[in-house]
Amino acid sequence: MDLIRKIEAQNKKNEAFVFNVGDTVKVVYKIIEGNNERLQSFEGIIISFQNKGIGKTFLVRKISSGIGVEKIFPVYSPIIEKVEVLRRGKVRRAKLYYMRNRIGKAAMKIKERLNFKRS
Protein backbone atom coordinates (compact mmCIF):
# COMPACT_ATOMS: atom_id res chain seq x y z
CA MET A 1 0.00 0.00 0.00
CA ASP A 2 2.88 2.38 0.65
CA LEU A 3 4.06 1.98 -2.95
CA ILE A 4 0.64 3.00 -4.26
CA ARG A 5 0.58 6.10 -2.06
CA LYS A 6 4.08 7.11 -3.21
CA ILE A 7 3.09 6.86 -6.87
CA GLU A 8 -0.12 8.81 -6.24
CA ALA A 9 1.81 11.56 -4.44
CA GLN A 10 4.22 11.91 -7.38
CA ASN A 11 1.43 12.22 -9.95
CA LYS A 12 -0.75 14.72 -8.08
CA LYS A 13 -0.62 18.33 -9.19
CA ASN A 14 0.62 20.80 -6.61
CA GLU A 15 -2.18 23.32 -7.08
CA ALA A 16 -5.24 22.78 -4.93
CA PHE A 17 -8.63 22.76 -6.59
CA VAL A 18 -11.05 24.83 -4.55
CA PHE A 19 -14.45 23.97 -5.92
CA ASN A 20 -17.35 21.99 -4.54
CA VAL A 21 -20.61 20.40 -5.62
CA GLY A 22 -23.07 23.09 -6.70
CA ASP A 23 -20.44 25.49 -8.01
CA THR A 24 -20.71 26.85 -11.54
CA VAL A 25 -17.33 26.32 -13.19
CA LYS A 26 -15.61 26.80 -16.51
CA VAL A 27 -13.25 23.92 -17.32
CA VAL A 28 -10.64 24.66 -19.99
CA TYR A 29 -9.09 21.51 -21.43
CA LYS A 30 -6.85 20.46 -24.33
CA ILE A 31 -8.16 18.63 -27.37
CA ILE A 32 -5.67 16.93 -29.70
CA GLU A 33 -6.90 16.32 -33.25
CA GLY A 34 -4.15 14.80 -35.37
CA ASN A 35 -1.26 17.26 -35.22
CA ASN A 36 -3.37 20.14 -33.95
CA GLU A 37 -3.85 20.97 -30.30
CA ARG A 38 -6.48 23.46 -29.16
CA LEU A 39 -8.22 24.57 -25.99
CA GLN A 40 -11.94 24.10 -25.45
CA SER A 41 -14.08 25.18 -22.52
CA PHE A 42 -17.05 23.50 -20.86
CA GLU A 43 -19.16 25.61 -18.51
CA GLY A 44 -21.70 24.12 -16.14
CA ILE A 45 -22.62 23.05 -12.61
CA ILE A 46 -20.67 20.42 -10.71
CA ILE A 47 -23.21 17.77 -9.74
CA SER A 48 -20.93 15.13 -8.18
CA PHE A 49 -17.45 14.03 -7.14
CA GLN A 50 -16.07 10.50 -7.19
CA ASN A 51 -13.21 10.21 -4.69
CA LYS A 52 -10.75 7.52 -5.68
CA GLY A 53 -7.36 8.96 -4.73
CA ILE A 54 -5.45 9.92 -7.86
CA GLY A 55 -8.45 8.88 -9.97
CA LYS A 56 -10.70 11.56 -8.43
CA THR A 57 -13.28 12.85 -10.92
CA PHE A 58 -16.02 15.46 -11.03
CA LEU A 59 -19.16 15.56 -13.17
CA VAL A 60 -20.18 18.85 -14.82
CA ARG A 61 -23.65 19.39 -16.31
CA LYS A 62 -24.86 22.10 -18.67
CA ILE A 63 -27.89 22.68 -20.87
CA SER A 64 -27.04 23.06 -24.57
CA SER A 65 -29.88 23.84 -27.00
CA GLY A 66 -32.41 22.51 -24.50
CA ILE A 67 -30.58 19.20 -24.04
CA GLY A 68 -28.66 18.30 -20.88
CA VAL A 69 -24.98 17.49 -21.46
CA GLU A 70 -22.78 15.90 -18.79
CA LYS A 71 -19.03 15.47 -18.90
CA ILE A 72 -16.73 13.68 -16.46
CA PHE A 73 -13.32 15.28 -15.81
CA PRO A 74 -10.45 13.66 -13.90
CA VAL A 75 -9.16 16.18 -11.34
CA TYR A 76 -5.47 15.34 -11.82
CA SER A 77 -5.55 14.96 -15.60
CA PRO A 78 -2.83 16.68 -17.65
CA ILE A 79 -5.40 17.65 -20.32
CA ILE A 80 -7.12 20.10 -17.94
CA GLU A 81 -5.55 23.53 -18.30
CA LYS A 82 -7.58 25.32 -15.62
CA VAL A 83 -10.83 25.25 -13.70
CA GLU A 84 -12.34 28.68 -13.09
CA VAL A 85 -15.09 29.07 -10.48
CA LEU A 86 -17.73 31.47 -11.78
CA ARG A 87 -20.30 31.12 -8.97
CA ARG A 88 -20.31 29.39 -5.62
CA GLY A 89 -23.44 27.33 -5.06
CA LYS A 90 -25.24 26.76 -1.77
CA VAL A 91 -26.44 23.14 -1.71
CA ARG A 92 -27.20 20.59 1.00
CA ARG A 93 -26.44 17.43 -0.96
CA ALA A 94 -23.25 15.68 -2.04
CA LYS A 95 -24.79 14.45 -5.30
CA LEU A 96 -27.12 16.67 -7.32
CA TYR A 97 -28.56 13.97 -9.57
CA TYR A 98 -32.04 15.43 -9.07
CA MET A 99 -30.95 18.25 -11.42
CA ARG A 100 -31.29 15.77 -14.31
CA ASN A 101 -35.08 15.75 -13.92
CA ARG A 102 -35.46 19.52 -14.06
CA ILE A 103 -36.30 21.41 -17.24
CA GLY A 104 -36.10 25.04 -18.32
CA LYS A 105 -34.59 27.64 -16.00
CA ALA A 106 -34.95 25.35 -12.99
CA ALA A 107 -32.40 22.98 -14.53
CA MET A 108 -29.56 25.41 -13.79
CA LYS A 109 -30.96 27.18 -10.73
CA ILE A 110 -28.96 26.91 -7.50
CA LYS A 111 -28.79 29.47 -4.69
CA GLU A 112 -25.55 31.42 -4.54
CA ARG A 113 -23.26 31.42 -1.53
CA LEU A 114 -22.92 35.07 -0.52
CA ASN A 115 -19.45 35.02 1.07
CA PHE A 116 -17.72 34.18 -2.24
CA LYS A 117 -14.80 36.37 -3.33
CA ARG A 118 -13.66 35.86 -6.92
CA SER A 119 -9.88 35.60 -7.16
UniProtKB/Swiss-Prot annotation:
Question: Which PROSITE patterns does this one have?
Answer: RIBOSOMAL_L19
Instruction: Give UniProt keywords alphabetically.
Output: Ribonucleoprotein, Ribosomal protein
Q: What's the domain of life for this entry? A: Bacteria
Q: Name one Pfam family in it.
A: Ribosomal_L19
Task of the protein = This protein is located at the 30S-50S ribosomal subunit interface and may play a role in the structure and function of the aminoacyl-tRNA binding site.
User: Which NCBIfam families does its entry note?
Assistant: rplS_bact
Protein name as annotated: Large ribosomal subunit protein bL19
- Source organism per entry reads Borreliella afzelii (strain PKo)
Q: Which gene encodes it?
A: rplS
